[in-house]
């Protein structure tokens, strides 16, 4: 499970508060020592409309050529174009199955960002052609996340280019606490969160589950051992009587 989560999301994300992330920091030796891949991205929440059905989605945007650097795109279960062209969209396997959407189909994406008209504020709508289908191995990701070109996303959601996130893919994603400490030293004015922060409740639940299972197994072993010892004790007593 952890491997799938790490494989789908960036290991750490740097968000800027008020201005673009400094290029000097991005090119720093300290960051290059930690990471093996850096990508700029942006995201927004919208609604997919297809064949009379609607579905809320988290849309993530990448540049045309950077999209193919994601692990899910390199995955052998990925089908379609590995470039993220303008006016095209990449959706998950679960979403494709549930809505009967195939590569080449058109879908409508609605944004909460409005267009001012004489009758009031209307939400933006754009039509995209499904260009690829990914399979992360986690149904929650596959049915709730989609990818579009980052420029299309920023136009659709009225997002500022300077507020793009920096996604950091670490050389050793399991040493996340050490990496976060180092990243805070590099990006001291920005907000940093990691894959561990995003999934804290899930990992806490898994830890509790492991502890409970350990206790249950320990009790089963103790009861089984007690039964074996009791059985042997009774057998020895019976044999002792027979010998006597």
List where the protein language model places each region.
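Short aromatic/hydrophobic contact patches that present stacked aromatics
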Residues: 13, 88, 165-167
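Mechanotransmission and gating elements of multispan inner-membrane complexes involved in transport
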Residues: 121-213
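Hydrophobic secondary-structure segments that place a key small or acidic residue at a functional site
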Residues: 42, 79-150
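Solvent-exposed, non-transmembrane alpha-helical starts
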Residues: 20-26, 49-51, 56, 67-72, ...
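Hydrophobic alpha-helical transmembrane segments of multi-pass inner-membrane transport and secretion
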Residues: 1, 207-244
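Flexible glycine-/small-residue-rich
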Residues: 16, 59-63, 111, 132, ...
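Hydrophobic, regular-secondary-structure patches
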Residues: 1-58, 65-68, 79-85, 184-185, ...
């Amino acid at each position: 499970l952890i491997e799938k989560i790490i494989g789908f999301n960036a290991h750490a994300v740097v968000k800027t508060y008020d201005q673009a992330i400094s290029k000097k920091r991005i090119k720093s030796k300290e960051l290059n020592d930690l990471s093996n891949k850096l990508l700029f991205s942006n995201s927004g929440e919208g609604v997919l409309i297809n064949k009379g059905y609607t579905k809320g989605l988290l849309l993530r945007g990448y540049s045309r050529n950077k999209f193919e650097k994601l692990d899910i795109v390199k995955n052998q279960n990925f089908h379609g174009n590995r470039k993220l062209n303008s006016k095209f969209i990449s959706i998950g396997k679960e979403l494709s199955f549930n809505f009967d959407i195939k590569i080449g189909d058109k879908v409508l994406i609605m944004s909460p960002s409005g267009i001012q008209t004489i009758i009031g504020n209307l939400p933006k709508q754009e039509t995209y052609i499904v260009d690829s289908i990914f399979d992360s191995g986690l149904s929650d990701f596959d049915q709730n996340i989609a990818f579009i070109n980052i420029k299309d996303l920023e136009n659709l959601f009225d997002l500022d280019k300077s507020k793009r996130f920096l996604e950091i893919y670490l050389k050793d994603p399991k040493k996340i606490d050490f990496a976060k400490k180092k990243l805070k030293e590099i990006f001291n004015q920005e907000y940093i969160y990691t894959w561990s922060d995003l999934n804290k409740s899930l990992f806490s639940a898994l830890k509790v589950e492991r502890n409970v299972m350990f206790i249950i197994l320990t009790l089963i072993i103790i009861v089984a051992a007690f039964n074996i010892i009791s059985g042997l004790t009774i057998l020895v007593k019976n044999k002792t009587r027979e010998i006597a």
